Design a protein with these regions (language model features):
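Canonical RING-type zinc finger of E3 ubiquitin-protein ligases
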Residues: 31-40
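Cys/His-rich, Zn2+-coordinating zinc-finger modules
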Residues: 3-22, 29, 46-87
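A detector for small-residue-rich transmembrane helices and their helix-helix packing motifs
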Residues: 2-3, 37
């Protein structure tokens, strides 16, 4: 898939995953997740849109941090929730 230039990439920072063991909210709630996404602005680890609670998308909206990277082993892609596109 092609990537697009995205002005939100200016928000990307060097981050350390806050909860490398899983979705921050799901761990607290003891909820299941499917895949994980890493916020590239603050290091929040949230669950994907295929997960029941979609915490990565919720974080992007509430914190205003739209750029995430897959936090799955072997995957190397980034997504912008504002533009709904790979970046």
């Amino acid at each position: 898939m092609a990537t697009i230039p995205d002005p939100h990439l200016a928000m990307v920072r060097p981050v350390t995953p806050r909860t490398p063991e899983g979705c921050e909210e799901c761990l607290m709630e003891r909820s299941p997740w499917v895949h994980l996404r890493l916020c590239l602005t603050c290091g929040h680890v949230g669950c994907c849109d295929s997960s029941p609670l979609k915490h990565a998308r919720q974080h992007a909206g509430s914190a205003g941090h739209p750029i995430v990277q897959s936090f799955q082993p072997g995957e190397d892609w980034r997504w912008c929730y504002v533009h709904e596109a790979l970046v």
